[in-house]
Amino acid sequence: MKVCVNFNDGRWKKYDIDFEKIANVVVGSKYKDAEVSITLTDDNEIHALNKMYRNMDKPTNVLSFELGDDILLGDIYISLDTVMREARDAGISVAEHTAHMVVHGMFHLLGYDHLTDAQARVMEGKEVKVLKKLGFKNPYADEQKFQWWKYVLTGLFGAIASLGFAPFNMWWVTVLSIAGAYWLLCADDDKVSFWRAWVRAIPFGAMYSISMFWWTVHSIYVVPEIAKAFAIWTVPALIGIGIFGAIFFVVPFVLARCIYIKSGVKPFLFGGACAFVLWLREWFLTGFPWNPIANITLPSAVVSNSMSLFGALGLTFVVTGLIASVVQVIQDRGGKANWFSFIFFVVSLLIGVGYGYKNISVSSMGKDSVVVRIVQPVTTQESKIALSRVDALNQAKTRVNELIKLAGDVRDVDVVLYPETSYPFALRPDDDVPIAKELKRPVMIGAHVVDYERRVYNALAVAEKTGDMVDFYGKSHLVPFGEYGPIKFVPAPANLTSGGGARVMSLQMDKDNRFIFAPAVCYEIIFSDAVIKNDFVDAIINISNDTWFGATPGTYQHMDMARRAAIESGVPVIRSNYSGISAFIGADGRIISQLPVGTVGVLDGTVHGSHMTLYRLLGRNAWFLIIMLFAVFGGFIAYRTEK
């Protein structure tokens, strides 16, 4: 076969490379009458060709242009600049790496490709055989040998990515971890199969999930009796948490890697996929949207308040898309489409910040609510265990008296708020609450309520100052494997009934004053639908019991989820937690006052500034559709820009 070599860059002439021999070893005798053209060039020329014919705005090592003819096979372009860099990084000579590029290009001219794993295995196998005949080693051996380092590094990025959330608040670690994982898993242009992309991303997803949710198994060991029964499930629980992450948190990386799109479009796909996963976590299998990426911005009031515009969904889309766009700009050394993506997400963030600044201003307006006293008992779960019915009854009576005593002098207080499950007796809908009667103040208290059909609710009971229970709210989002058993063969400590969903409640304080609030029991505060969008409320009343989690990160992250709820809804939060953190939270997510973890005491306060945000007005699902449209529209513009 005849090989025509064109020296478009004179630097090539100093290398003694037999291009004709290399090309003929590839084709053998089958193409002895054929011709191929090899042009030896530099990064500038191959960059222009790569952009013109492949829509890739960057240089590459080799380009092949197949003519589809048995005589004129086609043209191969090889860049000396890229070959020199890659040869230096691989620790081989320029001549050896050039031989590989010729072999690689020749197989492209013969119709081989590497768009899928199966294609890559066939093509790489043939390349290795030819290079062995030429006396060169397997160029893919190092990649295969050291591939495990990428898995380790990806897993490490996942493990430390959770440090951006409370109580550490090292947001830059999360940003760098996502950027590092994106660089390893998504930034390359080569397409890989869905399953290979998934396997590569599993270490990040699994380690990210375990490092972020490990504290959930802490609850097993709070009470010795429960520990004896459920400790055996610790390891399966951690494995399950890892599997959860390997399924959900890898989706953005997998899609950005296995879908063959232009580099400038990838940030829109990646950010959109991150928002999709968060939206899915809001409702799939009862939902668990804990720690959206948006929450790493809570240390910055103006940035986090952009959630009042487009919610955690929108801020997650913007933050993750911005991270990906920065990586693509660095990886590709610029490019119009990459710069467009970067500017798009920066502008989106600035728009959110502008709206957030407005939300902060509005949150400082309005009249104060009624004075609420939060009671934080800090009773351990173990101390609630009784050995007999008599002990249990006596213990419950003692605890009622302790709760009354702990409330103290309430003459300057309008309402007394107790945390989740603090009332030691089960209540019926027509029962009275003696604590309210004794204090002569309306009381909101966490209790188990048994309705007339003997269904048991984890509830917020509301009693007037006469002691009469006038209303109760049953928790709607129950904790899987804790408050109910979604899988029959896996035991659960309780089997409670789910309530009817988000609603508005009120207390008539006097003739002209009514305190209107939205109840949220425990982790219901993490869901975007905690407040019905068409109703005005003075506050969200959130009762919780984080005694199960002690001083683990989960307790502090739960507090941040309440702050997120305040920002998204534009409604201040009054939060009573059994062991802390109890707090008054402004409508802008600002902590007005709080009782730390493990501190017994009371906290008096008022809230103001409740208003309607654009996020609450449109709702979670509408904003999800808007975000997806922006992802598609932005990606299309980036594609057209690159094209």
Question: Where do the language-model regions lie?
Answer:
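An acidic/histidine-cluster motif and surrounding catalytic segment
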Residues: M1-T98, L110-K145
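Active-site-flanking alpha-helical
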Residues: T98, F107-Y112, S219, L285, ...
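Short, conserved active-site loops that position catalytic residues or coordinate cofactors/metal ions
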Residues: P167-G180, Y208-S219, Q376-P377, D412-R428, ...
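Active-site catalytic loop in hydrolytic enzyme cores
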Residues: H218-G240, A273-A275, W279-A312, V456-S528, ...
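Soluble catalytic regions of membrane-associated enzymes that act on cell-envelope
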Residues: Y355-P480, V504-P519, Y523, V531
